[in-house]
Amino acid sequence: MNISALKARIRASKEDLYPLPLEQIVVAEGALREAAAFIAKQAESGVVLVADSHTYKAAGRDLHDHLCQKGVKADWHLLEPNSNGDIIADEVSLISVMLKVEQSTKLLVAVGAGTIHDIVRFVSGKTNKPFVSIPTAPSVDGFTSLGAPIVVQGSKKTYQLVAPIALFADTVVLQHAPPALIAAGFGDMVGKYTSLFDWKIGSLLKNEAYSDLVADLTEEALSTCVDKVADIGKRTSAGVQVLMESLLTSGLAMALFGYSHPASGAEHHLSHYWEMEALRLGKKQLLHGAKVGLSTQIINRFYKNTVLPDVHRFLDDDEAKQVIALVEALPDPDDVKALLEQAGWNEALVPIAPELVEESLQHAYLLRDRYTLLRLYREGTTMKKEGDAHVGRS
């Protein structure tokens, strides 16, 4: 990725954004060697590498060999799955990593996908120890962001903490990632259709903070990703590189803005609701991006088929006109599904009960203090009903 070009765009925009957090981003074959060279410059000892048994085999072992060749002394911490076989970013995982961090620790290294990065990001932010990102799958857009979604006492909360100081993604490693993780990464990108929509709605109707540059960066990443969906589905080197760079751009956009609005709207709220229900019931977790792929279709269809015909009930004429134009510009939900399927996504990856879908459409907007069209619709129609009831009683 061309960080210099991105910095130039940021300067030219003259927008009041957060500084670009990463010193270096490499997405290429042989990136693990470059990662070892970077880490060696940061610290010759006091390096803690965090992975699980799968990501250690995927990239950790080779990275460790490269570090040894550079004379770097590094300790490993392998995260343990729960009874369902899932690595969860919860109190147990956080404490296990915290116990590996000592006063002499200079650098943390996250070797894995989204959850491992969430755990390391949280520990990095709380201990003031920088971390380096080594993604093993192009599965989520959170690698370069500031946010760490953490499960605390069964509920998920996102903590705004720190981005990695550098990221190295080896395309050979990415190509060998499980196909479901690659499909999930594409699902996370497809979610930008509705997240960008909801962010625009919040800005227009509720005066929420907005950035044209951040929106443009996110939209460009989405378009580039969609254009290469065939290559992504075939897991070509070019395909996984485009997907990884699109996900990273989305994460950087969030970091520049300081919040997740560009990449997380009602579609993510539905996904989080489903995840919390699975945690409550002790069920195995589903892939985040796979859920977002489904929730994007659901929320898109809900906006077009349910909200749009009812929009004048809770918005004035000028607001309704703006919302109608934006909803009509959203892609057809069936077209979104076709794109996802090209990337390897299928509904079997997300066996969500229809009852849970309906429940999430009713209540998921309450999970975040953020305006989305789903929130405006639920709150607006509720107020309308209450007002009508009051008139009826008077």
Curated annotation (Swiss-Prot):
Ni(2+) binds at D188, H268, H288. One of its GO terms (cellular component) is cytoplasm. Its EC number is 1.1.1.261. It comes from the Bacteria. Keywords: Cytoplasm, Lipid biosynthesis, Lipid metabolism, Metal-binding, NAD, NADP, Nickel, Oxidoreductase, Phospholipid biosynthesis, Phospholipid metabolism. The keyword tRNA processing does not apply. Gene3D superfamilies: 3.40.50.1970, Dehydroquinate synthase-like - alpha domain (1.20.1090.10). This is Glycerol-1-phosphate dehydrogenase [NAD(P)+]. It comes from Shouchella clausii (strain KSM-K16) (Alkalihalobacillus clausii).
